[in-house]
UniProtKB/Swiss-Prot annotation:
Cofactor: pyridoxal 5'-phosphate
Sequence intervals crossing the membrane: none
Keyword list, A-Z: Lyase, Pyridoxal phosphate
Protein name per Swiss-Prot or TrEMBL: Probable D-serine dehydratase
InterPro entries recorded: D_Ser_am_lyase, Ser/Thr_Dehydratase, Ser/Thr_deHydtase_PyrdxlP-BS, TrpB-like_PALP, TrpB-like_PALP_sf
Entry's Gene Ontology molecular function annotations: D-serine ammonia-lyase activity; hydro-lyase activity; pyridoxal phosphate binding
Length: 438
């Protein structure tokens, strides 16, 4: 499909004008069909969950703040009723059902959703090396990975990654604490405080004046020249993806504890901010495994960086970038500032994702301020992208397509997945708050 031809498409023209759009995915095919395209299944997610469990004693020792959750990195699921009322008042639209916030923004160690996938892939690599060199067995107490002799062993190896910020933060901190030499290749969008935090752990931060795609490509290139360097590929990694996917079974457990039902009469809607796609894609995969067709997964992207929407809508996936259409990929949502989506995630998940919408930067600041005022919860701009999702779901086309009745909608649970912000310095947070209009 030629770019010139695409530019005649009225929907693409809206994207090119940076208009906010909502698109319900006609390729969404239900779980039975959709999962067959992924190339992974529930046993892969289960193995990831078991690996994280093996590392629990390590976390308790290396990161004492995780002791209260017995070394398991998991985020709170909280009700945001005051925010729900404020959204209804400000937008003059109803939100039926329960509105909850999944606070990956406050996950331990790196304060973002990337603490799921990024940390998991570092652990998988560390375990592989330690097992191959007979430093541990799978039945051992993994807290011994804190021992100096094992850290010295890991120091012979290095890890590289390209990032807009949060993935680099999770991989950099985890890798450095284990003893690895870590290089994080950071795009122009990356926040200065994230670079400083990484440097405080002894991580080598390589800065670029170009966007995320260049940082990843350069990181990959640098890693190729060193046989002892492991490159974590945010665009194509199934390991990262599986680390995120464990969230599905964890959420199911939280629902059991909170008495929340998910079934035909109690649908679940989850709104996930999307950058390159690994985090939301992996979480959505885990959610579909856990809840089947009763969960609806909606991706939210900035109007200036709608890369996954563009890839899935056109079917071109990583063969097209937003810049090809003159869309600049410049957004306040630094974690979502990605011009070309993951080809792996797009192709794997295009039959499981139910919808996409875009949101302008100013709304992110407005919603950030509103959440702060109503619930006293502070997030970074990217993390607010999912907050207007419940307003979109009232669209009659969506309800008609999925045969959702008003009664079912009244029983629905809406989850806004807060992807980051728990570690943002106060000075930076005050700047964000000053930009909100509400």
């Amino acid at each position: 499909m030629k770019i010139q031809h695409l530019m005649q498409d009225p929907f693409i023209q809206k994207l090119m004008r940076f208009e906010e759009v909502m698109w319900f995915n006609p390729k969404s095919a239900g779980v039975k069909t959709g999962l067959s395209y992924v190339g992974l299944d529930v046993s892969d997610t289960q193995q990831a969950a078991e690996r994280l469990q093996r590392f629990a004693p390590y976390f308790c020792r290396a990161f004492p703040e995780t002791q209260k959750t017995k070394g398991i990195l998991e985020s709170e699921l909280v009700s945001i009723d005051k925010m729900k009322s404020a959204l209804i008042d400000h937008y003059h639209m109803p939100i039926q059902g329960r509105l909850l916030l999944k606070k990956d923004s406050h996950l331990p160690i790196s304060g973002s959703i990337k603490a799921r996938g990024g940390i998991y892939e570092v652990l998988a690599y560390a375990e592989k090396l330690a097992l191959e060199h007979h430093l541990i067995t799978e039945s051992d107490d993994y807290s011994q990975l804190c021992d100096e002799k094992i850290k010295d062993f890991f120091s012979r190896y290095s890890i590289a990654v390209g990032s807009t910020g949060n993935l680099g933060l999770s991989i950099g901190i985890m890798g450095a604490v284990l003893g690895f030499k870590v290089s994080v290749h950071m795009s122009a969008d990356a926040r200065e405080w994230k670079k400083q935090k990484l440097r405080s752990y002894g991580v080598n931060v390589v800065e670029y004046t170009q966007d995320y795609g260049v940082a990843v490509a350069q990181g990959r290139k640098a890693a190729l020249s060193d046989p002892n360097c492991f490159f974590i590929d945010d665009e194509n990694s199934t390991t990262l993806f599986l680390g995120y996917s464990v969230a599905g079974q964890r959420l199911k457990q939280q629902f059991l504890e909170q008495g929340i039902k998910v079934d035909e009469n109690h649908p679940l809607f989850v709104y996930l901010p999307c950058g390159v796609g690994g985090g939301p894609g992996g979480v959505a995969f885990g959610l579909k495994l856990a809840f089947g067709d009763y969960v609806h997964c909606i991706f939210a992207e900035p109007t200036h960086s709608p890369c996954m929407l563009l890839g899935v809508y056109t079917g071109l996936h990583d063969k097209i970038a937003v810049q090809d259409l003159g869309i600049d990929n410049i957004t306040a949502a630094d974690g979502l500032a990605v011009g070309r989506a993951s080809g792996f995630v797009g192709r794997a998940m295009e039959h499981l994702l139910d919808g996409f919408y875009t949101i302008e930067d100013q709304k992110l600041y407005d919603l950030l301020g509103l959440l702060h005022k109503t619930e006293n919860i502070q997030l970074e701009p990217s993390a607010l992208a999912g907050m207007i999702g419940p307003l979109h779901i009232n669209h009659s086309d969506y309800l008609r397509r999925y045969h959702i009745t008003q009664e079912q909608l009244a029983n629905a649970t809406h989850i806004v997945w807060a992807t980051g912000g728990g570690m943002v310095p106060d000075v930076e947070m005050q700047k964000y708050l000053s930009l909100g209009r509400f």
